[in-house]
UniProtKB/Swiss-Prot annotation:
Pathway: Lipid metabolism; prostaglandin biosynthesis. Keywords: Cytoplasm, Fatty acid biosynthesis, Fatty acid metabolism, Isomerase, Lipid biosynthesis, Lipid metabolism, Membrane, Oxidoreductase, Prostaglandin biosynthesis, Prostaglandin metabolism, Transferase, Transmembrane, Transmembrane helix. The gene is PTGES. Homotrimer. The chain crosses the membrane at residues 14-42, 62-91, 97-120, 125-153. Its cofactor is glutathione. It is a multi-pass membrane protein. Belongs to the MAPEG family. Terminal enzyme of the cyclooxygenase (COX)-2-mediated prostaglandin E2 (PGE2) biosynthetic pathway. Catalyzes the glutathione-dependent oxidoreduction of prostaglandin endoperoxide H2 (PGH2) to prostaglandin E2 (PGE2) in response to inflammatory stimuli. Plays a key role in inflammation response, fever and pain. Also catalyzes the oxidoreduction of endocannabinoids into prostaglandin glycerol esters and PGG2 into 15-hydroperoxy-PGE2. This is Prostaglandin E synthase. Residues 1-13, 92-96 are lumenal.
């Protein structure tokens, strides 16, 4: 007998969560690579040893574009890590597959737009709207998890 697939174990919620989560982690890696590329292009290094390697201590400095990349990455960590926990737990509550997929998709798209808005310096309120939209499914999942946990006390 073949081993059960993810879809058989948890309906369609877990595979959708795993897809969106993995794509978001890849996006975080991409932002980290972009940050490194901006550092090299702008010759703005956080560590003296890196500055020495790339031209001298005068390049041990801050840069607005590098700082923007770092803020985008920090914001990813502040939102994507909680999503990873909430989405995984939510997947095992047996949610309606379509509703779960919409939760994951809305979060994913919101974070993608947020990153493009942040790194691309798009006009306000694009970034804040994307942030807010992405937080709605997280709030929904958190409330459902709390409700289910409280029901079983």
């Amino acid at each position: 007998m073949p081993p059960p697939s993810l879809a058989m174990v948890s309906g369609q919620a877990l595979p959708a969560f795993l897809l969106c989560s993995t794509l978001l982690v890849i996006k975080m890696y991409a932002v980290a690579v972009i940050t490194g590329q901006v550092r090299l292009r702008k010759k703005a290094f956080a560590n003296p040893e890196d500055a020495l390697r790339h031209g001298g201590l005068q390049f041990h400095r801050d840069d607005q574009d590098v700082e923007r990349c770092l803020r985008a990455h920090r914001n990813d960590m502040e939102t994507i890590y909680p999503f990873l926990f909430l989405g995984l737990v939510y997947s095992f509550l047996g949610p309606d597959p379509f509703v779960a997929q919409m939760h994951f998709l809305v979060f994913f798209l919101g974070r993608m737009v947020h990153t493009v808005a942040y790194l691309g310096k798009l006009r306000a309120p694009t970034r804040s709207l994307a942030y807010t939209v992405a937080q709605l499914p997280c709030a929904s999942m958190a409330l459902q998890i709390v409700w289910e946990a409280a029901r079983h006390l």
